[in-house]
Regions:
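Juxtamembrane intracellular "pre-TM" segments in multi-pass secondary transporters
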Residues: 7-19, 267-307, 498-503
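Residue-level signature of mid-helix packing/kink "hotspots" within the transmembrane helices
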Residues: 41, 69-77, 184-185, 349-357, ...
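Extracytoplasmic gate region of multi-pass secondary transporters
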Residues: 43-47, 302-357, 415, 449-450
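Cytoplasmic membrane-interface "Motif A"-like loop-to-helix N-cap segments
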Residues: 85-96, 365-379
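C-terminal ends and interior cores of transmembrane alpha-helices
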Residues: 97-130, 380-394
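Cytoplasmic helix-loop-helix junction between adjacent transmembrane helices
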Residues: 141-180
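Glycine-rich segments within core transmembrane alpha-helices of 12-TM secondary carriers
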Residues: 171-199, 352, 439-449
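C-terminal transmembrane helical hairpin of 12-TM major facilitator-type secondary transporters
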Residues: 369-418
Length: 503
């Protein structure tokens, strides 16, 4: 469809107003969703500080992250139904307020834990009972936060198709998708700065030095050991500000969303977009049985949907393995400061933005809309650069960061394209169900990444973690190979379904 025909017989003034609101909706939701990441990915930068002060293990962190991932996936699936029945604008804003409250609670988690066990919250040495209570409080607040995080995406999935014509949706959604990486990159840089500049300077306290040395298993007699110890001793309790400051930003973000968004064109006196109804004839209505049969054909028995779901597990294990655990690995195994580790993960996300846009362009212009073929290229590229990163540890830091960033360039292509491929294979009438199913599989991958990385890192070390991540990338590539012959979309399958229904 040519661009000038997208708006049918609308007047120039109506088109101008519609485009203004379309751009406004895209920008407001991009900023709002990026702020959701500030109160989600801050935990990754706080983890090294929590380990240094309280000796919390990678296994404990992994269990918390893993359970949170499952809660997030379930919440996102359920809230898709909630948003269909309520104001997407209000739901998205309220979700961000609730995330802010859970982050404020996490920042006060140590004080709450001390009160519950009757300990002194000002003490620099925590008792085992206090640490156990802290882990429990931490788990509860993270799980609550992940439940509220699941409110963030469904409103966007409902709002954007109301304002963007189907012929432009893939291109503009790929641009919108960069909000994930923009938010994550900004969050890790901001929290990296917080961890390296805020908190109390207790480097003069020998008890603090000994506590950190014991928790991180470092020798204060060595220069490298003391350097790492001091970076935490000089910024004691900085981790708390990684939750309080983003929480304040989230409150402002909620106001931004509520003021800036409208649910659909009709709410501002504009007409609905032409050609945004379902693919079947306007007079045709599905019965419950027909709808159930359609979903069975297009989703539940569609081999390509299930292949994409399985592939999404591998994609999320790779992506979240780096995003959730990158700061800890880089500080503990590569000896980086928290600030440098934050910039490394930020570079990973910045390159991911470029990779997402490049993958979308290549899908349309090289692979003629067959997103699964571009996903194969991306998984091979991500596995290759992860191999270079782990097997060449002696590279200069700048080169190492570049290699890690190139892994981000490739891994975010499938993360964005699987949603588009699922929608195409299921057709727009079943795209929400297909994406919900793929999303659940993705966060099963997050759960496996969280639990697996924590346990493996504690028992066999960080190198083994990355060997496994590379292996996961290879399995993902093999999965996409099995889709090479798949069609671009499922519309022929859908037409065949309705043709058979009329016989």
């Amino acid at each position: 469809m040519e661009k000038e025909n997208i708006y049918g017989n609308w007047s120039p003034e109506v088109i101008k107003q519609f485009k203004k609101w379309q751009l406004r909706t895209i920008l407001v939701t991009m900023v709002g969703y990026a702020i959701y990441y500030f109160v989600r990915k801050n935990f990754s930068l706080a983890m090294p500080g929590l380990t240094a002060q309280y000796g919390i293990s990678n296994t404990d962190f992994g269990i918390v992250i893993g359970i949170g991932s499952l809660v997030y996936g379930f919440s996102r699936f359920v809230n898709g139904f909630v948003v269909d029945r309520h104001s997407a604008r209000a739901v998205m804003a309220i979700g961000l307020v609730l995330c802010a409250l859970s982050n404020f609670a996490f920042g006060f988690g140590y004080n709450i834990s001390a009160w519950l066990v009757g300990a002194d919250p000002m003490a620099t040495q925590a008792t085992p009972d206090l640490i156990n209570m802290l882990v429990l409080v931490m788990a509860l607040t993270i799980v609550l936060n992940q439940a509220f995080q699941g409110v963030g995406y469904p409103p966007c999935a409902r709002l954007l198709p109301c304002w963007i014509h189907p012929s432009e949706l893939a291109t503009k959604m790929s641009v919108w998708n960069t909000s994930h990486s923009i938010g994550a990159a900004a969050a890790v840089v901001a929290c990296g700065y917080i961890m390296g500049s805020m908190g109390q300077d207790l480097s003069h306290n020998p008890d603090v030095i000994n506590t950190i040395a014991a928790n991180l298993k470092l020798d204060p007699a060595t220069a490298d050991g003391m350097k790492q110890i001091l970076q935490y001793a000089r910024h004691w309790d900085a981790w708390k500000w990684c939750f309080w400051l983003p929480a304040g930003l989230a409150i402002l973000g909620a106001v931004w969303l509520f003021v800036g968004l409208r649910d659909d064109p009709r709410s501002v006196g504009l007409p609905e977009l032409p050609d945004t109804k379902t693919g079947k004839s306007d007079t045709e209505k599905d019965t419950r049985a027909t709808r159930s049969a359609f979903l069975r054909v297009m989703v539940w028995t569609n081999r390509w949907i299930w292949t994409l779901c399985i592939a999404n597990v591998f994609v999320y294990v790779m992506r979240m393995g780096i995003l959730d655990w990158g700061p800890k690995f880089l500080t503990e195994a590569r000896g980086m400061s928290i600030e440098d580790a934050a910039w490394a993960v930020a570079a990973f996300e910045i390159f991911a933005i470029i990779g997402t846009l490049a993958a979308g362009w290549a899908t349309d212009h090289i692979f003629r809309g067959k997103a699964h073929r571009m996903c194969l290229v991306c998984m091979v590229g991500a596995s290759l650069f992860m191999s270079l990163f782990i097997f060449l540890p002696g590279l200069p830091m700048v080169v190492s960061i570049f290699v890690l960033a190139m892994a981000g360039f490739f891994i975010y292509g499938p993360q964005a394209l699987i949603g588009i491929a699922s929608a195409n294979q299921a057709t727009k009438e079943a795209s929400a169900t297909a994406n919900g199913l793929a999303g659940i599989f993705g966060y099963v991958g997050s759960f496996l990444s969280a639990i697996g990385v924590g346990i493996v890192a504690d028992h066999w070390g960080w190198n083994v973690v990355f060997y496994l991540i590379i292996g996961i990338g290879v399995l993902g590539a093999i999965t996409f190979i099995t889709m090479w012959a798949a069609p671009r979309d499922g519309y022929a399958r859908s037409q065949n379904f309705y043709a058979n229904l009329k016989k």
